[in-house]
UniProtKB/Swiss-Prot annotation:
This is Co-chaperonin GroES. Belongs to the GroES chaperonin family. Keywords: Chaperone, Cytoplasm. The keyword Coiled coil does not apply. One of its GO terms (cellular component) is cytoplasm. Gene3D superfamilies: GroES chaperonin.
Length: 97
């Protein structure tokens, strides 16, 4: 299924990150918590400004981002994979290699 977010929305697939406890024990499943890193799968056209102009988004498809799951984050299942639909303002940083 192809999905295209509207306006300043971004579709992110959560990246699995290995978590370790303070004692060095590898945590898995619910003990590890959910990652706040993900890969951008799709982006909207941009934020509509008061002037009516559209400001393009700073993130692009393929970027790895660190995000905050704000109150507006929506979890969806698309093609048997869980994705998040968030606003660009919920993205805190782009991870550069």
């Amino acid at each position: 299924m192809k999905i295209r977010p509207l306006h300043d929305r971004v579709i992110v697939k959560r990246k699995e990150v290995e978590s370790k406890s303070a004692g060095g024990i590898v945590l898995t499943g619910s003990a590890a918590g959910k990652s706040t890193r993900g890969e951008v799968l799709a982006v909207g056209n941009g934020r509509i400004l008061e002037s009516g102009d559209v400001k393009p988004l700073d993130v692009k498809v393929g970027d790895v981002v660190i995000f905050s799951e704000g109150y507006g984050a929506k979890t969806e299942k698309i093609d048997n994979q869980e994705v998040l639909i968030i606003s660009e303002s919920d993205i805190l940083a782009i991870v550069e290699a």
